[in-house]
Amino acid sequence: MPTLRALECLVAVLDAGSITDAAAALHLSQPALSHQLAALEREIGAPVVERLPRGVRATAVGRTIEADARAALAAAERVVGAGRAVAHGAGGQLRVACAESMTAGLLAPVLRTWLRRNPLVRLTLTETTSADELVRLLDSGVADVAIGPRPTRWTGAEAVIGVEEIVAVLPPGHVLAEHKSVSFDQLTSEPLVHYHPDHGLAGWLDAEAARYGMVPSVGMRTRQASTAAQLAAAGVGVALVPTTALGTGFRGTLRRMRPRVQRDLLCLIGTPSDVLVRPFVADVLRRGVPIPAAVHAAPA
């Protein structure tokens, strides 16, 4: 395979029409330039330039490969330019994965600020309903950074964003609204708006309930935490919902759990040294875990 240096020497010789002038333009000695041309000719199996009494000219082979040689050099320049642009934050691609319940409340404000500050960065977002699926996206190279609860297995770099609370969203006029907080015992006979079995929240909440000897009674299932909150607010049944899924405009009735049900939220970092990942993670950590107004308004 010819080197870029050999192609550069060929193009310089064709432009200058002289070994001497081409060597001077590239700041090479004439023997060094001739060595590069000889290596190129050995690779191809034919001469690329013809030595004349005064100067040189391209052979038929040299004329044939000249355009591709110039294109290869231009492509190499673009590679270097693109890399430098990313290194200075002027471009590139950032691939983010996020637990779907956290996209609107936690991640959206960070994305808005990030894209405004880095308009040349191509940002892709993949949502999942499982923390272990976030790990799969990182391990397979689909995502550079992932935001979600703690997975069952992760040995890479991570940063704790904060603690997220799970609250009970109640139908309008529900008897449990008379209480300042709700326990799992009080939900034993309540048909819950629960999550599909393949949703990470389903297994996690079942395990939390089991700690208090309670097996959730399922009235219906949904795949989205925000939908569970809306269904509960519409009177379908009680839902246990992460606060990040409520959104700033949520107006339903909610109560905190007793004792509090909480989980850590993390940035799982697949490429810690990436020049885009580092500042993005820093922005997410500065944002922290938002607490919607409805949670602030709930009885203490």
Regions flagged by a language model, labelled:
Residues 41-63:
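A short LG(V/I)-centered, amphipathic sequence patch enriched
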Residues 7, 43-44, 65-87:
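Alpha-helical linker/hinge and terminal dimerization helices associated
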Residues 131-134, 139-142, 149, 196-253:
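Hydrophobic hinge/microswitch elements
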Residues 155-160, 164, 226-273:
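Beta-alpha-beta core module
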Residues 91-153:
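Central regulatory/effector-binding core of bacterial HTH transcription factors
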